[in-house]
Amino acid sequence: MLPVLIVLGLRLFVFGMYAIPSGSMENTIMPGDRVITTRLSPRPIALRRGDIIVFKDPANWLANEGATHNSDRLIKRLIGLPGDTVECAGNGAPIVINGVPIDESAYLKPGVEPSRSAFSVTVPAGRLFVLGDNRANSADSRAHTNDGAQGLVPVGDVEGVAFMRYWPLNRVGWLSAHHDVFRDVPTRTPTS
């Protein structure tokens, strides 16, 4: 009985398991993949740029996407933390965070631009800016700037950081956050 309680406790309080319904995170995570998250983020472990986060749909993002699954959870890469200014000139230009252009080739789907459209967002306290790795097929923060939440995810809606793929068996392995991509980006203090 004790082993069952331990497993149940771990599942409820430490780890989450999620099925991936869309191609918004290709080629990092494919449709049908299943991932494990740690529920220890954002507390007590701090979120970092590059983390692959699972979060509650902040402003009904899935409503206009013709979603066929019945989950209100999304998975994207964390790009902007509170205080960050995230911008892009569009048309293949790199994403720029706090004045530093970042090279996302380590995780962007091959052949996909960082963003076709231009944008500039300063992330307020308590919010996050997220993007899919397959930007051509991702309704992420860029696509929801007029949703009432300005396309930003409340930190409290984050359910965990994905760190491992457990299905399909031929793709079992660790997921990389590619924190090194963001190493030169300075930290900014958020405003309310």
Residue ranges and their predicted role:
Residues 13-19, 27-192:
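Soluble "head" domains of membrane/secretory-pathway proteins
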Residues 1-13:
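Hydrophobic membrane-insertion alpha-helices, especially the h-region
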